[in-house]
């Protein structure tokens, strides 16, 4: 996953300490990309945000609490709703270039996607999260097909799909990109 908390020792405090350290050392904008799923329960605003029903409002609440905890105007927090693999749903057909013979499974993923407004809303359940759905589609029920390579496939699909498609299909992702572009326009990079 893209959760720095797992990389930084499993606690939000380790993430904040590292983030503050980077911000002190640099004079540029600093950002993050963490998955909403599996945020540590010591993440700022955790209890409050998890009581918010609307998923977009919930993730924004987390980002605001993260921004406040870091305490720098040069920090642009981003938490992916629900996980990075939601962006892969913008280009499901590209998975077929890596994983031949999965056409029926990819069609099932497209059907899942058609039931929601956009890829960011594909799921709100860790058991059937975007990555879990993709893994099941690629590896099969009994894992007799491919071994799904999340980093490689995610990078491949994102490059093939392109930034404009990701932005047009994923509103929360787009708002993050707009904030980064505004920072560039202000000369803060």
Segment roles from a protein language model:
Residues 8-17:
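Ligand-binding grooves and catalytic loops that recognize ribose/phosphate and carbohydrate rings
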Residues 1-9:
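A short beta-strand-loop structural module common to alpha/beta enzyme folds
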Residues 16-189:
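C-terminal accessory helical subdomains adjacent to catalytic cores in phosphodiester-
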């Amino acid at each position: 996953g893209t959760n720095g908390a797992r990389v930084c020792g499993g606690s939000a405090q380790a993430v904040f300490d590292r983030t503050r350290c980077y911000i002190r050392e640099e004079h540029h904008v600093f950002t993050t990309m963490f998955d909403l799923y599996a945020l540590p329960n010591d993440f700022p605003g955790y209890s409050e945000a998890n009581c918010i029903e609307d998923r977009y409002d919930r993730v924004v609440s987390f980002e605001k609490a993260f921004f406040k905890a870091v305490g720098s105007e040069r920090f642009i927090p981003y938490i992916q709703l629900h996980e990075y693999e939601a962006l892969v749903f913008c280009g499901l057909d590209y998975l077929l270039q890596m994983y031949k013979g999965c056409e029926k499974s990819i069609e099932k993923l497209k059907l899942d996607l058609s039931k929601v407004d956009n890829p960011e809303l594909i799921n709100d359940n860790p058991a059937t999260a975007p990555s879990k759905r993709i893994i099941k589609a690629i590896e099969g029920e009994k894992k007799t097909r491919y071994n799904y390579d999340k980093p490689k496939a995610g990078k491949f699909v994102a490059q093939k799909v392109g930034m404009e498609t990701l932005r047009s299909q994923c509103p929360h992702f787009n708002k993050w990109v707009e904030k980064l572009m505004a920072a560039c326009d202000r000369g803060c990079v």
